[in-house]
């Protein structure tokens, strides 16, 4: 699975800042967890998270805007540093890999933490060996590879950027948690690549929400892919 169809630069700038910050510490003092009423039946299968940072109208980046749209605040940054999922395996496509490994090679502050994390790149265009440490290249069908990782692995997984990869994994019903941080800005004229373009219909069960710095909204859902509009009583996954 290659994510070369997206315009990656602005999205990657937001992505690298999020993951650099979230890899600094693994304190659990600010961890958000589902309440007992919302938790589903426990399973030994590792979970897959999709993480996105978006404007209100669903864009991950916009022409001329800084990372995080210049709206990050101390509460949000503290939550990133307390991220309990920093030891998860990171999944990405080829374009995201090229950008992120380039940031690391250039010594972008904090990217040394990413070098210590286990990473899997899905691509039919990259060739081994990959230069970024602890990175495994998987060619072929990404959905089937991730399905096998969930069935046989022990570590939770989360995506980094890679919009087309995320779309494929969600459509296949492999995503356990859909986590989005919404920033209070609409980038209708400058937004690049709407994150939800090409998605199927998805029912979302909210299990967590939080407001940071009085303006940034964290929303965490359990997704269910729908076979049709409400009332059809059919789901794909």
Enumerate the language-model features and the residues they cover.
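Extreme N-terminal basic, low-complexity initiation segments
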Residues: 2-10
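Low-acidity, Ser/Thr- and Arg-rich intrinsically disordered low-complexity segments
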Residues: 4-5, 15-23, 27-29, 33
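Enzymes that bind and transform nitrogen-containing heteroaromatic metabolites
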Residues: 31-237
């Amino acid at each position: 699975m290659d994510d070369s169809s997206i315009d990656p630069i602005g999205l990657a700038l937001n992505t690298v800042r999020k993951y650099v910050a979230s890899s600094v510490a693994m304190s659990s003092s600010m961890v958000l967890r589902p309440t007992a009423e919302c938790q589903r039946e426990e399973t030994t299968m590792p979970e897959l998270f999709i993480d996105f940072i978006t404007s209100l109208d669903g864009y991950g980046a916009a022409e001329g805007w800084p990372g995080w749209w210049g709206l990050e605040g101390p509460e949000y940054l503290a939550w990133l540093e307390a991220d309990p999922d920093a030891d998860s395996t990171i999944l990405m496509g080829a374009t995201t890999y090229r950008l992120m490994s380039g940031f690391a090679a250039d010594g972008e502050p904090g990217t040394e933490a990413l070098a210590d994390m286990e990473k899997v790149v899905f691509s039919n265009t990259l060739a081994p060996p990959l230069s970024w440490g602890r990175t495994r290249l998987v060619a072929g069908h990404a959905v089937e590879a991730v399905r096998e990782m969930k069935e046989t692995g022990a570590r939770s997984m989360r995506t980094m950027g890679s919009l087309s990869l995320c779309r494929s994994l969600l459509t296949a019903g492999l995503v356990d948690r859909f986590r989005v941080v919404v920033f209070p800005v609409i980038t209708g004229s400058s937004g690049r690549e709407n994150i939800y373009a090409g998605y199927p219909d998805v029912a979302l069960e909210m299990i967590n929400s939080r407001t940071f710095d009085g303006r940034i909204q964290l929303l965490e859902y359990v997704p269910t892919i729908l076979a049709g509009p409400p009332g059809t009583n059919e789901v794909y996954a």
